[in-house]
UniProtKB/Swiss-Prot annotation:
Protein name, UniProt field: Succinyl-diaminopimelate desuccinylase
Superkingdom of the organism of origin: Bacteria
Biological process terms in GO annotation: diaminopimelate biosynthetic process; L-arginine biosynthetic process; lysine biosynthetic process via diaminopimelate
Record's function text: Catalyzes the hydrolysis of N-succinyl-L,L-diaminopimelic acid (SDAP), forming succinate and LL-2,6-diaminopimelate (DAP), an intermediate involved in the bacterial biosynthesis of lysine and meso-diaminopimelic acid, an essential component of bacterial cell walls.
Positions of the catalytic residues: D75, E140
Pathway participation: Amino-acid biosynthesis; L-lysine biosynthesis via DAP pathway; LL-2,6-diaminopimelate from (S)-tetrahydrodipicolinate (succinylase route): step 3/3
Amino acid sequence: MHLPTLSLVEELIARRSVTPDDAGCQALIAARLAALGFEIHALPHGPADARVDNLWAIRRGQGDGPTLVLAGHTDVVPTGPLERWHSDPFVPSHRAGLLYGRGAADMKTSLAAMVVAVEEFVAAHPVHRGSVAFLLTSDEEGPAVDGTVKVCEWLAARGERLDACIVGEPTSVRQLGDMIKNGRRGSLSGRLTVVGQQGHIAYPHLARNPIHLAAPALAELAQQRWDDGNEHFPPTSWQMSNIHAGTGATNVIPGELVVDFNFRFSTESTPESLQQQVHALLDRHGLEHRIAWTLGGRPFLTRPGSLTDALSQAITAVTGLRTELSTTGGTSDGRFIAQICPQVVEFGPVNATIHQVDEHCEVAALGPLKDIYRRTLEAMLA
């Protein structure tokens, strides 16, 4: 175990930072970074009743070198049923070499390891090249509209150059270091409304049943091959998540059918091309329809280069593992950072219990995680 990292992650877990509440996590981290000579910028955003806390902190070195950003979120998801937890989710607890608490894996362990890694790096290299920065938000587990995306807009307006970024998401699968995420698929959601005509169920000739009308089109959408993917991404997928029609009465043909759906799309497709294909298919089926579209994020990919090399080599040096680069899984705030930063990867602890009751991480992995971050800093900035 590594006591400085353990102590900090316990302090962070003890703060009830259920999204979008930061609960003082960023102030705690900012104080430690300020002591290292970081410029601190608190960037709150959003309405007063749902304020999001954001933090940008940067330590500028001397001479040429990249700006390496360590990014993450201080918010956590709700606990779920407290009675199912074996201990209070906001009281750090140890059992059998595991640290339990909400955020233990996603992602307060990564934040603590990053902070301590930077403290060790600055102590060893007080005069370093390039810059090291932190980008933190309390709006990753929520709508993600007042968090990282707003900080990125602010950074772009200031002309701040970002060269590389590590997002501390829990990417490891079976053991620390076995996977780096070097990209993510895009996410495009839609709410489809198919218009029919309400009527009595005994007189279908006087009505138009939107369920019956839409069924063939929905079946075709589910079977459609949108693209073939590529060496980095699987083929684009389309999935329905919710279907609703009817008044609740059993003798009424509904007037509308509402379907929620989502694309997870590769770099072989664009939001515009997918939207066009969906509308064309529905038109071909003769459906009167409308769709409210929401673009959650475009896909991004960081090809092997200086950042993936430095991080991969650090993982091998600390764990002995040869890591895997992968683009699987859901979206993260990396999708926003990738719009202003050419190299974005995600790396953190094992993700087996994230968002679950009794979320936990392995205490013995805290030191190695911190060492991996520190070695990456040294490779790029020392």
